[in-house]
Amino acid sequence: MSVLNREQNLVINPALGGTALWRFACGYSPKDMEAQHAPLPLLFIALPIVLNERFRDIVLGTQKSRGLSAFAEKFYLTKFKEVEKDEIAAISRGVPQYRKFTLNSIAVAIRTNLISLDADTARILPMHHNNIKNIPKSVKDILDASEKLGIWCRGTDLAAVQNLLSVSL
């Protein structure tokens, strides 16, 4: 295995992906709103966004209260020089590219009791909301971005998410 492949496996692995999806589910279903759970298809947009450093930085740099539309808007405004207008297409391309990885990450998250899948409703619920302590900043950023993305998706219906991010789920 090459050094690059080994580094990718250390950073992009189903355990990290599963943990990020758990934080997404926590954002979507906060403790005080446990009856509202994330639709399974939404999990397929989370990893292509939060595991991409550029997109993750944009999520982290967007105010939580502004929502998903403010994140998507940054791809269309010319004043944001760090983002090219056609980069939102990279999210759309990332969804099918990450599909198998996302499925593996979901499986890990379920096996480790981070999330549960309601087979009747195809919704994901977090098994707990405990914070993880003493983690590297790079991992914390991924988890924080994932949770924020979950919060934003909670306030946006599935069709609007697909439209804003130009994705097909």
Where are these regions (language model features)?
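Basic amphipathic alpha-helical segments that dock to polyanions
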Residues: 102-113
